[in-house]
UniProtKB/Swiss-Prot annotation:
<keyword id="KW-0597">Phosphoprotein</keyword>
<comment type="function">
    <text>Catalyzes the conversion of glucosamine-6-phosphate to glucosamine-1-phosphate.</text>
</comment>
<feature type="binding site">
    <location>
        <position position="247"/>
    </location>
    <ligand>
        <name>Mg(2+)</name>
    </ligand>
</feature>
<dbReference type="InterPro" id="IPR005843">
    <property type="entry name" value="A-D-PHexomutase_C"/>
</dbReference>
<dbReference type="InterPro" id="IPR005844">
    <property type="entry name" value="A-D-PHexomutase_a/b/a-I"/>
</dbReference>
<dbReference type="GO" id="GO:0006048">
    <property type="term" value="P:UDP-N-acetylglucosamine biosynthetic process"/>
</dbReference>
<dbReference type="GO" id="GO:0009252">
    <property type="term" value="P:peptidoglycan biosynthetic process"/>
</dbReference>
<dbReference type="Pfam" id="PF02879">
    <property type="entry name" value="PGM_PMM_II"/>
</dbReference>
<dbReference type="Pfam" id="PF02880">
    <property type="entry name" value="PGM_PMM_III"/>
</dbReference>
<dbReference type="Pfam" id="PF00408">
    <property type="entry name" value="PGM_PMM_IV"/>
</dbReference>
<dbReference type="Pfam" id="PF02878">
    <property type="entry name" value="PGM_PMM_I"/>
</dbReference>
<dbReference type="GO" id="GO:0004615">
    <property type="term" value="F:phosphomannomutase activity"/>
</dbReference>
<dbReference type="GO" id="GO:0000287">
    <property type="term" value="F:magnesium ion binding"/>
</dbReference>
<dbReference type="GO" id="GO:0005975">
    <property type="term" value="P:carbohydrate metabolic process"/>
</dbReference>
<dbReference type="InterPro" id="IPR005845">
    <property type="entry name" value="A-D-PHexomutase_a/b/a-II"/>
</dbReference>
<dbReference type="GO" id="GO:0008966">
    <property type="term" value="F:phosphoglucosamine mutase activity"/>
</dbReference>
<protein>
    <recommendedName>
        <fullName>Phosphoglucosamine mutase</fullName>
        <ecNumber>5.4.2.10</ecNumber>
    </recommendedName>
</protein>
Length: 451
C-alpha cells in the first residue's frame, strides 16, 4: 500500500498531502463505502473530525467535498480526539469515521485516517480498493446530480456524548485529587475542563490554547519537561500529558518523575487482575516495552504477549486472542472493554480512579517497575534480512545474552521504512548497556554495514 501507511495517509500538508489528494481520498473512500453498504441505505453516513492544526480545515473541506460527490451523508464533529471518532462511529451506527490528524508529529504534517463501522481501522481489503481507485489513470466513478449528492451537517453534540461515555467508565467521581494537565495544544484542549470538572477534580492546565500552529510544540506526551516542572510547582498529585490527537497519555508523579506507558499499563493491569477484570491475567505489549515492566509483571503473576511495534498490532493481537489490556511505552494504551483504540482521556480516568481508591501516591504505584536503561543504535546495512541472519551477528547476540544471564535483554530488528538494522539492549546500568550495544553494532558494521 503506497498511500495508506500504518496510520492512514500522511505527509506535509498542502505539499504531499494536498487538498486535491484529500478530495480523492474522500471521493474514492466514500465510493468504496457505498459499495459495501447495505442496500436500504443509499446515503451511508460518515463522521469527519480533525485535530487543531492549521491545515485541518483545508483538508477537511476538500475531503468532505469528495465524500459529498458520491452521495455520502457527512456529520462534522469539528475538533475532537481520534478515539472519540472511533467511539462515535460505533454508537452512532455510521458507515465510517475519518480523522484528520498527524497525531504526535510536528505541525506541518497532517494525515487522514479512516475507521470502519466497528470502530477499528478499515479492513486491508477496503484500503486496497481505495488505493486501486487512487492509482487508476482516470476517475470513472458516477457523478450524480440533485438527489444523488450527499449532505453535510455539524454534529456538535458528539463531544458531549463522548464525555458522558468516559465518565461512565469509572465507578465514582474523583473529588479530593489535585492534578496537572498538558493537552499539547491539541484535540483534548477543549475536552479536559468539561470532563475533569464533571468529575469534581481540582485541576491546573498547560497547553490548552491551540492557535493552529502550537500543537505538540515543546508540549504534550512527547515533550513532558514543562509538565514535570508544573506538577512540582503546583503541588499536584499527578500530571497527565496527551498528544496532539489524544490517543496517548503519559503521567508524571508527584515528585516530577515520568511514568510512561509501560508503568501505566502495569499499574492498571495489576489493579484489574486484583479485581478479576484482566482477561487471562495478560497484558499485550510491543517488543519495545521495558524489561523492568516484565520483571514487575512476573513478580505479580501477570502474563505478557509481545507484538511488533505499532498500536495496530497490539489491537490485532488483543482481538484475536481475547485480551482486554494492551499498549505501548509511548502511552498508546488500549482498554478494549471500553474503546477500540488507544484513548488518552480514558487511560487518564482509569489511572486516576486507581489513585483515588488505593489512596496511594503515583510514585508508590509505579515503584514496582524499575526501568532498565535502554540504548538503541541504528546501523546502515545493504540487506536487512541478511544482516539479521548473519552467523557472526547471531553469535555476538548469543554471547551478550549469555553474559546478561536474565538481567538484561537484546532486540535486533530491521527498520520498517529505512535500510537500517536497529540494535537495542537493556541492562542494569548505562555503562553496561552501552557496552553491549556497542559490541553487537560493531559486528553488524564489520559484517554487513555500509558507510
Amino acid at each position: 500500500m503506497k498511500y495508506f501507511g500504518t496510520d492512514g495517509v500522511r505527509g506535509v500538508a498542502n505539499q504531499e498531502l494536498t487538498p486535491e489528494l484529500a478530495f480523492k481520498v474522500g471521493r474514492f473512500g466514500g465510493y468504496v463505502l457505498t459499495q459495501h453498504a447495505d442496500s436500504q441505505n443509499a446515503h451511508p453516513q460518515v463522521l469527519v473530525a480533525r485535530d487543531t492544526r492549521i491545515s485541518g480545515e483545508l483538508l477537511e473541506n476538500a475531503l468532505v467535498a469528495g465524500l459529498l460527490s458520491v452521495g455520502i451523508e457527512v456529520l462534522r464533529l469539528g475538533v475532537i480526539t481520534t478515539p472519540a471518532v472511533a467511539y462515535l462511529v460505533r454508537t452512532q451506527g455510521a458507515a465510517a469515521g475519518v480523522m484528520i490528524t498527524a497525531s504526535h508529529n510536528p505541525v506541518e504534517y497532517n494525515g487522514i485516517k479512516y475507521f470502519g463501522n466497528d470502530g477499528y481501522k478499515l479492513s486491508d481489503e477496503m484500503e486496497e480498493e481505495i488505493e486501486a481507485l487512487l492509482d487508476a489513470p482516470t476517475d470513472d466513478l458516477p457523478r450524480p446530480t440533485t438527489d444523488g449528492l450527499g449532505t453535510v451537517e455539524d454534529y456538535s453534540e458528539g463531544s458531549q456524548k463522548y464525555i458522558q461515555f468516559l465518565e461512565q467508565t469509572i465507578a465514582d467521581d474523583l473529588d479530593g485529587l489535585h492534578i496537572a494537565v498538558d493537552s499539547a495544544n491539541g484535540s483534548t484542549s477543549g475536552l479536559v475542563s468539561r470532563l475533569y470538572a464533571d468529575l469534581n477534580l481540582d485541576f491546573d492546565t498547560i497547553a490548552t490554547t491551540p492557535n493552529g500552529l502550537n500543537i505538540n510544540d515543546q508540549v504534550g506526551s512527547t515533550h513532558p519537561e514543562q509538565l514535570q516542572k508544573f506538577v512540582v510547582d503546583q503541588g499536584a498529585a499527578i500530571g497527565l500529558a496527551f498528544d496532539g490527537d489524544g490517543d496517548r497519555c503519559i503521567a508524571v508523579d508527584e515528585e516530577g518523575h515520568l511514568v510512561d506507558g509501560d508503568k501505566i499499563m502495569y499499574i492498571c493491569g495489576k489493579y484489574m487482575a486484583e479485581h478479576g477484570r484482566l482477561k487471562k491475567d495478560t497484558i499485550v505489549t510491543t517488543v519495545m516495552s521495558n524489561l523492568g515492566m516484565y520483571k514487575a509483571m512476573e513478580a505479580h503473576d501477570l502474563q505478557s504477549v509481545k507484538t511488533k511495534v505499532g498500536d495496530r498490532y497490539v489491537v490485532e493481537e488483543m482481538r484475536k486472542s481475547g485480551y482486554n489490556l494492551g499498549g505501548e511505552q509511548s502511552g498508546h494504551i488500549v482498554f478494549l472493554d471500553f474503546n477500540t483504540t488507544g484513548d488518552g482521556l480514558l487511560t487518564s480516568l482509569q489511572l486516576l480512579h486507581i489513585l483515588k481508591v488505593t489512596g496511594k501516591k503515583l510514585s508508590e504505584l509505579a515503584a514496582d517497575v524499575k526501568t532498565y536503561p535502554q540504548k538503541l543504535v541504528n546501523v546502515k546495512v545493504s540487506d536487512k534480512q541478511a544482516a539479521l541472519t548473519n552467523p557472526q551477528v547471531q553469535a555476538m547476540i548469543a554471547t551478550v545474552e549469555k553474559e546478561m544471564n536474565g538481567d538484561g535483554r537484546v532486540l535486533v530488528r530491521p527498520s520498517g521504512t529505512e535500510p537500517l538494522l536497529r540494535v537495542m539492549a537493556e541492562a542494569p546500568t548505562e555503562e553496561t548497556v552501552a557496552a553491549y550495544v556497542g559490541r553487537i553494532a560493531d559486528v553488524v558494521r564489520a559484517e554487513v554495514g555500509v558507510e
